A protein has these predicted regions:
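Juxta-kinase regulatory segment immediately upstream of eukaryotic protein kinase catalytic domains
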Residues: 1-31, 248
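Conserved ATP-binding subdomain of kinase catalytic cores across diverse folds
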Residues: 20-123, 148, 152-153
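Active-site flanking residues adjacent to catalytic metal/cofactor-binding acidic residues
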Residues: 53, 158, 179
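AlphaC helix of the protein kinase catalytic domain
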Residues: 124-133
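Conserved alphaE helix
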Residues: 135-146
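Catalytic-loop of the protein kinase fold
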Residues: 155-162
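Conserved protein kinase catalytic/activation segment
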Residues: 164-178
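C-lobe/activation-segment region of protein kinase-like
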Residues: 174-253
């Protein structure tokens, strides 16, 4: 690739020389934590800071032009800019460090690298998959407050799934952060939209019932109607999903 563009969060300017080398060393260095269409590695900066580097696949076909010509913002660019908005609204997401874009001789977008602070020691919501009663009630309520707060602040995460909500618990209570935030909606979030956004969570039916009931209470909506609606949408979503992907445990629908 002929050209590299780099944007660095001013707080991390002192890492510049290390960050600029990432495209050259990415194949050889770091620890792989996810492989798929995109590749994610954890790497260590010279000062010992652990960073998360996500390399987005090269856009193909019409998308190559759509993103290269700036008709639509590339995913990496959105994922670099959105945390700034979330931070201002008090919603947790890994701190963005830098964005690197490679382009070829005729200006078509190659690999994009999104570099964020690595968040360790956090749980995902996959862990409530087949959790026992008595272990998840407080978490379900806290998650409901987090989702309602986000929606009331006019922010909706379009991929609000068990793997994209990380959490930890300490003496102050539960803390949540959202990841994979390149698909967001900013603007009024209706109750129906907000409830529909909860359909992808798995776990015991009771976990979902508590989550949705509490969410409805916070947003001043009928609990029965909310639970009824989300349970139907959730069953539809997981039935479709189950036809294409194996589900690792018994899903109560």
């Amino acid at each position: 690739y002929k050209e590299m563009k780099i944007k660095i969060n001013p707080k991390y300017e002192e890492m510049r020389s290390f960050l600029e080398r990432i495209p050259d060393v990415f194949e050889k260095e770091g620890r792989v934590i996810y492989t798929g269409r995109n590749l994610i590695k954890v790497m260590e900066a010279p000062d010992g800071t652990l960073i998360n580097v996500k390399r987005y696949h090269v856009p193909k076909g019409p998308n190559s032009l759509i993103y290269s010509l700036g008709i639509r913002k590339p995913k990496g660019e959105r994922a670099f800019e959105y945390p700034m908005i979330l931070e201002k609204k008090g919603i947790g997401t890994p701190a963005p460090i830098a964005l690197i874009e490679e382009r070829n001789a005729i200006g078509l977008l190659g690999y994009t690298y999104l570099i964020t602070l690595q968040c360790d020691n956090l749980h995902t919501l996959y862990e409530v998959g087949d959790a026992a009663p008595g272990t998840y009630e407080k978490l379900a309520k806290a998650l409901a407050h987090f989702a309602a707060d986000m929606h009331n602040k006019k922010i909706l995460h379009k991929d609000f799934t068990p793997g994209n909500v990380l959490w930890k618990q300490d003496e102050e209570g539960f803390h949540f952060i959202i990841v994979d935030i390149n698909r967001m909606k900013f603007g009024e979030i209706s109750i129906k939209e907000g409830l529909y956004n909860l359909r992808k969570f798995w776990g015991p039916k009771e976990f979902i019932r508590i989550l949705v009931s509490e969410y409805a209470k916070v947003r001043d909506y009928s609990v029965d109607e909310a639970v009824d609606y989300v349970m139907k949408e959730r069953a539809k979503f997981w039935t479709r999903y189950g036809k294409k992907h194996p589900i690792k445990f018994k899903l109560e629908l």
